[in-house]
UniProtKB/Swiss-Prot annotation:
Purpose of the protein: Probably phosphorylates lipids; the in vivo substrate is unknown.
Protein name per Swiss-Prot or TrEMBL: Probable lipid kinase YegS
Record keyword Flavoprotein present: no
GO BP of this protein: phospholipid biosynthetic process
Entry-linked SMART domains: DAGKc
Positions of ATP binding: 40, 66-72, 95
Cofactor note: Binds 1 Mg(2+) ion per subunit. Ca(2+) may be able to substitute.
GO cellular component, one term: plasma membrane
Organism: Escherichia coli O6:K15:H31 (strain 536 / UPEC)
Top-level taxon of the source organism: Bacteria
Family annotation (SUPFAM superfamilies): NAD kinase/diacylglycerol kinase-like (SSF111331)
Gene: yegS
GO molecular function terms listed in the Swiss-Prot or TrEMBL record: ATP binding; lipid kinase activity; magnesium ion binding
InterPro entries: ATP-NAD_kinase_N, Diacylglycerol/lipid_kinase, Diacylglycerol_kinase_cat_dom, Lip_kinase_YegS, Lipid_Phosphate_FormReg, NAD/diacylglycerol_kinase_sf, YegS/DAGK_C
Residues the record marks as active site: 271 (proton acceptor)
Length: 299
């Protein structure tokens, strides 16, 4: 068997009792692969483990968890300086796994682990909000953000991505649109937004394709706004094709500025960020990620 450089797996603490994962790691170790494992307990652990990974000289840091774990690890990687920065590997173990699903990471743990270690490392973009917080997949605002933020953990654990839809249906009568103004390159819109999606990736909220044209290595962010005054009529209208849908506004830009007269909340790969002013910009070729050769999000 070919020799591969060492890897370090940063595993979300919720997945420590995953027996199939333990077995998959043991099998690869028996085949001669060096895989270090570190468990996250609190915010900031991922950044510390990335520092350790660099000292160990590993070629890949694998994010084992959901979109939030991938976000933490990728953010820590793009903050590294110097040469020989490890590539990002992805092991989908979260509730929705939106980014992993959209880029074509296998669901089978053994296949995903092998891809994370031996896959081709490709330069991909990330996005940054207000020069501080980053996201690798998507920033969502409005209805979708409130649903993903408020969905109970027990419901997510039991039903996965479907839980977001169920909780959303339960809350429809209480949700109102957000008034805001959005600017970008050759783009300007203002009005009432029920859902805002700004994507480096394509899907969020357990498989909802909010930005179906997004690519992760084109230097652009994709914007999609669902407009309207009432939730149910707007959701019904989304069943139409995009060309016939007056409730969908789309744009593409390397940056977007968002202003609101009141505080609104964006969900950045699962982490909420509230405010009235947001500057979101793309960071081209910010890190290398091990992806399948047929990844649909590459140009």
């Amino acid at each position: 068997m070919a020799e591969f450089p060492a890897s370090l797996l940063i595993l979300n603490g919720k997945s420590t009792d995953n027996l199939p994962l333990r077995e998959a790691i043991m099998l690869l170790r028996e085949e001669g692969m060096t895989i270090h494992v570190r468990i996250t307990w609190e915010k900031g652990d991922a950044a510390r483990f990335v520092e350790e990974a660099r000292k160990l000289g590993v070629a890949t840091v694998i994010a084992g968890g959901g979109d939030g774990t991938i976000n933490e690890v990728s953010t820590a990687l793009i903050q590294c300086e110097g040469d020989d920065i490890p590539a990002l590997g992805i092991l989908p173990l979260g509730t929705a796994n939106d980014f992993a699903t959209s880029v074509g990471i296998p669901e089978a743990l053994d296949k995903a682990l092998k891809l994370a270690i031996a896959g081709n490392a490709i330069a991909i973009d990330m996005a940054q909000v207000n020069k501080q917080t980053c996201f690798i997949n998507m920033a969502t605002g409005g209805f979708g953000t409130r649903i993903t933020t408020e969905t109970p953990e027990k419901l997510k654990a039991a039903l996965g991505g479907v839980s977001y839809i169920i909780h959303g249906l339960m809350r429809m009568d209480t949700l109102q649109p957000d008034r805001c103004e959005i600017r970008g390159e050759n783009f300007h819109w203002q009005g009432d937004a029920l859902v805002i999606g700004i994507g480096n990736g394509r899907q969020a909220g357990g498989g909802q394709q909010l930005c179906p044209n997004a690519l992760i290595n084109d230097g652009l962010l994709q914007l999609r706004i669902f407009t309207g005054d009432e939730i149910i009529p707007t959701l019904v209208s989304t069943l139409k094709s995009d060309e016939d849908n007056p409730n969908i506004i789309e744009g593409a830009s390397s940056w977007f500025d968002i202003q609101a007269p009141h505080e609104i909340t964006f969900n950045l790969d699962g982490e909420p960020l509230s405010g009235q002013n947001f500057h979101i910009e793309i960071l081209p070729a910010a890190l290398r990620c091990r992806l399948p050769p047929d990844c649909p999000l590459l140009r």
